[in-house]
Amino acid sequence: MKDNFYISTAIVYTSSKPHLGNTYDVVLADVIARYKRLRGYDVYFQTGTDEHGEKIELKARENNILPQEYVDNIASCVKDVWDSLNTSYDKFVRTTNSKHKELASKIFDKLYEKGDIYKGNYKGLYCVPCESFWTESQLVSGNCPDCGRPVKEASEECYFFKTSNYSRWLYDYIEGHPGFIEPESRKNEIINNFIKPGLQDLCVSRTTFKWGIPVSFDSNHVIYVWIDALSNYITFLGYDPCGPSSLEFKKYWPCDLHMIGKDILRFHAIYWPIILHCLGLEMPKKIFAHPWLLFSNDKMSKSKGNIVYAEDLISKYGVDAVRFYLLHDIPFGSDGNYTEELFIDSINTNLANVFGNLVNRTIGMANKYFSGKITNIKEYADVDKELVDLVLSLDSKIENDINNVRISDSLDKIMEVYRRCNKYIDETEPWVLYKENKLDRLNTVIYNLIESIRIATVFLQAYLPDTANEIFKQLNTDINTMDSVLEFGQYNSNMIGEASPLFKRIEK
């Protein structure tokens, strides 16, 4: 029986069209989902859109359309962008879905019945863009600590979730489960900035707008975003707090990995675990808060006029060029930076020079020197063994990196093999071997290159699926499974295909 693996991304808020920075976590999650499928896991990959709230109600009014029409348009746009990025999600969810609304309402009712939700009055500070409440001490220079924009005074009747009752439980759970929140620096922020000072009860309903799921027993209130949006991870699996849950829920929950942006870690690492605890459910196994993608070292925002859209880059440079930049050039644990110059440099340096050039040269030599017919001769010189050992080390290295969500590191290890192959060509000088009529040695060199490319490309399928498929086509092989990377020499003497440029250099 295959092991199950459930990975989710944060659902995208449908107040506006997604920009390049919004695509980062879904592409990261896609790599992990594809990799786990290659490993034989039964993967469930969920993503989607968060479609309720005050900001959406205001945006719809500005556009003179109903909120449902507004979110329909944005959700369709998000799905199109995710599809254009070649993401392999299993379910694209929307919180305006009728079944989700029914189950989220039941979750709210269940928490109320248990005494974990009570009615009160809120008076304090509120950020409309983030839909977050703040205390004076949490502000940064008088503004929202998440987005930096001004907050406003707010006063209204609402229902509160008794998060303050669970500070000790949450602290003990986090400390008792290393790896539950990663990276470690983010875990420390959650503990030191929020849990140790003492959690405040959380406002979980609103009365100042109507675009949301009504509270079933109090029609003046709508369920606030945190119970509505966070519950998507279980409602779309068929969790029902009042009756039998679905087989799908029993199969995949708890989630193996919540992939989210660092700006929403507070909600996933504090409120979500407490909600699950109150419902008597298991915790997700890991919550990973990834860094941001910045534009010229500044956060992307419409107000700053520095928005870049993924679909524009895809139409200009191709989907795998965009995926590569997101996956390779944003370092583990720190914010990445986008400029068009950096993007083009990465394509030229990594994809055209290292990667495309290697495949083109290798296939070209196989056809030129042996009319495309290469045989496996297992007699290795020291320089061969160094290459082979590096290639065979990929399996354990990438497994470790993927399990630790070090995606950029893992992709660079694949690139290291391609770079080493280029160096191997310089070291072995195939053109000299041909000139000196050392054809057996020449055959071995070219075979080692082909097999090294093939094995590295088996892993590449998780990162750049279209490019990987094209390489296998040019190598004329279908030996592309994970069990074929454990032993060097699986390439089976096919008549190799014709070389075709994978990536072209871009002139600035």
Predicted regions mapped to residue ranges:
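Short functional micro-motifs and their immediate structural scaffolds
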Residues: 135, 152-153
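Structured secondary-structure scaffolds
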Residues: 1-47, 94, 99-103, 129, ...
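A non-catalytic, amphipathic alpha-helix used as a structural packing/dimerization or gating element
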Residues: 31, 69, 73-80, 106, ...
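Basic, alpha-helical terminal appendages of large translation-related enzymes
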Residues: 1-4, 48, 120-125, 129, ...
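A broadly conserved sequence feature marking short terminus-proximal activation segments
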Residues: 70-126
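A charged helix-plus-loop insertion that forms the helical arch/lid used to bind
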Residues: 59-72
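Active-site-proximal binding-pocket segments
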Residues: 265, 326-329, 333, 339-342, ...
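Short, charge-patterned binding micro-sites
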Residues: 49-55
